[in-house]
Curated annotation (Swiss-Prot):
It holds the Pfam family Voltage_CLC. It comes from Schizosaccharomyces pombe (strain 972 / ATCC 24843) (Fission yeast). One of its GO terms (biological process) is intracellular copper ion homeostasis. GO terms for cellular component: chloride channel complex; early endosome; endoplasmic reticulum; endoplasmic reticulum membrane; endosome membrane; fungal-type vacuole; Golgi apparatus; Golgi membrane. The record marks E218 as: Mediates proton transfer from the outer aqueous phase to the interior of the protein. This is Putative anion/proton exchange transporter C19C7.11. Residues 100-144, 189-196, 274-284, 344-362, 440-442, 508-520 are lumenal. InterPro entries: CBS_dom, CBS_dom_sf, Cl-channel_core, ClC. The record marks E275 as: Mediates proton transfer from the protein to the inner aqueous phase.
């Protein structure tokens, strides 16, 4: 295409505007090459076309004689797939619970009667009845040897987990919630949900937890459940990746992961709504609820805790709370907010240093953190215990258990000592969490944060109890009426756990419901709501978002949030022309052959190409995805009349003349309109970045076209808009992000069409 022709086709977009865009490109290209590295690992879906395709399928079914049977089949098939996913998630959770508890206890001793029993089951099924358990034996009665064995087992477990992650599935490291949130929002990454990742997550998670690292299973359980849903839907060919149905499966699977991790089906559904999906969809909620019920039902049937309960620990408090305790409860809420912000800031600082100095030494990094954690934890009873067991003891009333640890904790003469031990445990575990969560092993942060809050809460309860014992007749304690047991420290541990979890995740309703389902403490509704709301408010004032959203932002993961664009003064008034791709590779509706089309696809590997009326007018008539072009080419090759110089057309074009065209058959032209999106989404060039962000969020197309005076002047993809919004929110001078991929010379490609040599490269055209 000559320079004059290119100028004619660009007449609707004046040269001054183009010079401005080119100058921006030169000044800002570095930023987008740097920030786009994480985004490029993801593919974008096209939800608009998926909705249209599903509607077309519905129309075909409606025209069938068996439409009612087809609809019954489709509905029943959906519930069948969800039940399979829920059942598999429940069984996986059962195995995780059993294996994790055994590995955690084997560091401290073994069962003489049944080697495969953990300490709790060993004592339950032992023939010896009484306060002491003789069937469970420590490895040795020497403190130094037990210390060494405890650390050696921890090192062995973490090495196995870290090596598996490094050599088999690096994407299995960490929690996975941030990436899954991006996938649900429309940025797809099939490798993150692969069978290999699922396998490593299943095997590596119990090892990582049993190693003594301050990590939990809840976040990885969400990732594991989503990989299960993804792979089952692929086996049954139930949902196309990127479709609305696929999104619902991912949300339902993620919700079931939380449900089985906490034994909280309603909490799992709320987690899917509040944290993962970012919106309210009745169908998605019903799917999530059914999947959670299936998973928790299977877990209840398998009964991993041998108590008939699916919750980690059930609490029954004989008394209630007093209004004067709200003062102490508020302190717990403030602590939760401060804890969350402190851990997040320190964690991301450590991660920055890890990426800079330890990116090649993930296994040694995890091993070093584990050894230090084990050496310190063994010296403190509340760090040495498994975190869930420790919380179970801290949540109890003193008169409700005969556990040796709880007996010591409830001894009035040991209050000062226990307060110091809990303070040390709180501080040490907070530091451990910041180092452990970023290790290259499967790792969650829910339970470690709850354990920190529980130890701190019980410590505050002991302090409140000591104040009451010192001043029983104070005005502050009039509601106690001189009762000996007026304050229950276990309730403070419960509320502290809720506050810390809210502070780190910035969730509200989900945490309140999870705590109720987890413990059954329904008479503490008001205090729980108070501490969660206070912790979340403190966190919002200090950091705005929780650790999952902040990980998305810091790691450069793609998540388009239009509310940020709308509320940002930097993007609300900036026209979309500042960030669009203006040098486009287009397909004219006339004068194009297979030879030119294939050469263009090999030379310019984009996900799709706009189709225009002709090279001069740039009037947009449709959009062709590369996958659709490949499908049309494979079908056309089967026709006897196929040649590489055969003319292509896209529907009825008046200027072509009388030559015939057909989809495939005896003609001099082939009509590809059936493979083209004939209703692409386009906006005027005067629209702002914020408005276009809303369109991407609501409709989720793969690309939006920009028009001026009826002609195509540019396009913007979801990835490019995401980078642009981020750049503006950082108050920088913006460049055209799309030119990371599309900064090519329109003149060069069109002039080269005449000299293309056919090469059997990416496309099998021989």
């Amino acid at each position: 295409m000559s320079s004059q022709k290119r100028a004619d086709s660009s007449s609707s977009f004046d040269q001054a505007e183009r010079r401005s865009l080119d100058e921006n490109e030169r000044k800002k290209k570095y930023f987008f090459n740097r920030e786009g590295s994480g985004i490029d690992n993801f593919e974008t879906d096209d939800r608009v076309n998926e909705i249209i395709n599903e509607q077309n399928e519905e129309n075909v079914i409606d025209q069938s004689r068996w439409s009612k049977l087809w609809r019954i089949w489709n509905v029943g098939y959906s519930w069948f797939i969800l039940s399979i996913i829920g059942t598999t998630v429940g069984f996986a959770a059962y195995m995780l619970d059993i294996v994790t508890s055994w590995l955690s206890d084997i560091r401290r001793g073994y069962c003489t009667s049944h080697w495969y029993y953990n300490e709790k089951f060993c004592c339950w099924y032992s023939e010896t009845m009484g306060s002491s358990c003789t069937a469970w034996k420590p490895w040795t009665y020497k403190f130094s040897l037990n210390y060494l064995i405890y650390t050696a087992f921890a090192l062995l477990f973490v090495l196995c987990a870290a090596i598996m992650v490094r050599d088999v599935a690096p994407l299995a490291a960490g929690s996975g919630i941030s990436e899954i949130k991006c996938i649900i929002s429309g940025f797809l990454r099939d490798s993150f949900l692969s069978f290999r990742v699922m396998l490593v997550k299943c095997v590596g998670l119990p090892l990582a937890i049993a190693s003594g690292l301050s990590v939990g299973k809840e976040g990885p359980s969400v990732h594991l459940a989503t990989t299960i849903g993804h792979n089952i839907s692929k086996i049954f060919k139930y949902a196309r990746e990127g479709s609305i149905r696929y999104r619902d499966i991912c949300v339902a699977s993620a919700a079931s992961g939380v449900a089985v991790a906490f034994g909280s089906p309603i909490g799992g559904v709320l987690f899917g709504i509040e944290e993962m999906s970012g919106g309210y969809d009745p169908k998605m909620i019903v799917y999530s609820f059914f999947c959670c019920l299936s998973a928790v039902g299977v877990l209840h049937m398998l009964n991993p805790f041998r108590t008939g309960q699916v919750v980690l620990f059930e609490v029954r408090y004989s008394g209630s709370w007093h209004f004067f305790e709200l003062l102490f409860f508020c302190f717990l809420g403030i602590f939760g907010g401060l804890y969350g912000e402190f851990v997040m800031r320190l964690f991301f600082l450590i991660q920055k240093l890890r990426k800079k100095y330890l990116s090649r030494w993930g296994v040694l990094d995890a091993a070093f953190v584990t050894v230090i954690t084990s050496l310190v934890s063994f010296l403190n009873p509340w760090l040495r215990l498994d975190m869930t067991l420790g919380m179970e003891l801290l949540f109890q009333e003193c008169k409700s258990s005969s556990s040796p640890e709880l007996i010591n904790l409830c001894d009035p003469s040991l209050r000062t000592k226990n307060t110091i031990l809990l303070l040390i445990a709180t501080f040490a575990r907070t530091i451990f969490v910041t180092f452990s969560y970023g290790a290259k092993v499967p790792a969650g942060i829910f339970v470690p944060s709850m354990a920190v809050g529980a130890s701190f809460g019980y410590m505050i309860g002991l302090i409140a109890e000591m104040i009451y014992q010192r001043f029983p007749n104070s005005v502050l304690f009039l509601a106690c009426h001189g009762s000996e047991s007026c304050i229950t420290p276990g309730t403070y541990a419960l509320l502290g756990a809720a506050a810390s979890l809210s502070g780190i995740m910035h969730l509200t309703v989900t945490i309140v419901v999870i705590m109720f389902e987890l413990t059954g403490a329904l008479n503490f509704i008001l205090p729980t709501v108070l501490v969660v709301a206070l912790a979340n408010s403190i966190g919002n004032m200090l950091g705005k978002t929780g650790i999952a959203d902040r990980s998305i932002e810091i790691n450069g993961l793609p998540l388009l949030e239009p509310e940020k664009s709308i509320n940002s003064s930097n993007t609300i008034n900036i026209p979309i022309t500042e960030v669009m791709a203006s040098n486009l590779i287009t397909i004219p509706s006339i004068g194009f052959t297979w030879r030119k089309l294939l050469g263009m696809m090999e030379g310019y590997d984009f996900s799709g190409y706009p189709v225009v009326l002709d090279s001069r007018s740039n009037y947009l008539i449709g959009y062709l995805k590369k996958s659709s072009l490949k499908s049309s080419f494979e079908a056309a090759k089967l026709e006897p009349s196929f040649t590489f110089d055969q003319q292509l057309c896209f529907g009825k074009v008046d200027s072509v003349g009388d030559s015939k065209s057909s989809k495939f058959g005896e003609s001099d032209r082939i009509d590809l309109s059936a493979y083209m999106d004939v209703n692409p989404i386009s906006v005027l060039h005067t629209q702002s970045i914020a408005n276009v962000a809303v369109l991407f969020e609501v409709l989720s197309p793969s690309v939006i076209f920009i028009e001026k005076d009826g002609n195509l002047v540019g396009l913007i993809s979801k990835k490019d808009l995401l980078l642009a919004s981020k750049y503006y929110q950082e108050d920088n001078d913006l460049v055209n992000p799309a030119n990371r991929h599309r900064a090519v010379s329109t003149e060069r490609i069109n002039d080269s069409y005449e000299n293309i040599e056919l090469k059997p490269l990416k496309l099998n055209i021989e």
